[in-house]
Amino acid sequence: MKFSIGLRWEEWEADYSDSLQESFNPTDKMSGGKISLIKSMTNGTNMYASLAKGYKQGGFNLGLGLDANSTNQNLAYDPEFLTNYELGINTKLLDSKINFNGVLFYSNREDQQVLISTQTDPSDPNTFSFLTQNAAEGVNHGLEINMDMDINQSLSAFVNLGILKTEIKNWQSRQDLEGRAQAHAPERSYALGLNWAPTSHTYLAIDFTGKSSFYYSDSHNNKSKSYVLTNLNLGYVKNNWNYELWARNIFDEYYSVRGFYFGNEAPNFIDTLYERHGDPRHIGVSIRYDF
């Protein structure tokens, strides 16, 4: 059995002043570290348990167009701290034809940094912007599984699966969002694919990646739809050169990756959802030389 420990300490200082006469000098002292136990079995299986604490420093929201009545409550945000617990396993099955990795995790986020949208003038869409604030607490837990399989000498496959549950907790300024999932945290994500190499110079690869629906933002309750993308690669390799014909999103799936909710259309400037969509089908050629 192996035991490892790591520690980190940081002191962060900053100076802020602007044309609205806001001026302050925040100082944050942050610490983190990791403790892990690793058990190696005789059959090549490794199991581990870890406890880690990390942090993300605070900062400022710039370019918000805030008026003179605004306070530094909107301008500055505090550090976020994360405590993470993990149990994991790595093993090889069927005479090393399958490589399996699995992780169970639970994370507690304190002073969670959340990205929200604001519009200082409801009748002026040019005042729409994003800012970071602190929610009191957030919780993440889930499962990750990765498998690589050698089916035969020329055919291999992979499967990646993620299950994630998240929750916003104890957010005093937005109690309506307490208990809701965090933004951009789909409950299910996956990828699977096949790689076929009929000769030492040629290969064909196809993969499918998908996500379930997720909330666009921590400032409104609009969600994306689930989607699956299909990608294809056809390649030729010789003398350190790699020639590849590829296609991304070959079925031209229409899907959204971001969502913005604000008033933009006169005369009433009613809050409306505007979505940014992912890349459509695109095809290309790549040439690479490996030294």
Task: Name each model feature, range by range.
Residues 1-3, 44-47, 95-100, 154-157, ...:
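Repeated loop/turn-to-beta-strand initiation elements of outer-membrane beta-barrel proteins
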Residues 47-48, 76-141, 150, 162, ...:
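Membrane-embedded beta-barrel scaffold of Gram-negative outer-membrane proteins
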Residues 68-70, 168, 183-237, 248-252, ...:
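C-terminal beta-barrel architecture of Gram-negative outer-membrane proteins
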Residues 9-15, 51-57, 64-66, 93, ...:
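Transmembrane beta-strands of outer-membrane beta-barrel pores
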Residues 11, 106-108, 127, 131-218, ...:
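Gram-negative outer-membrane beta-barrel transporters
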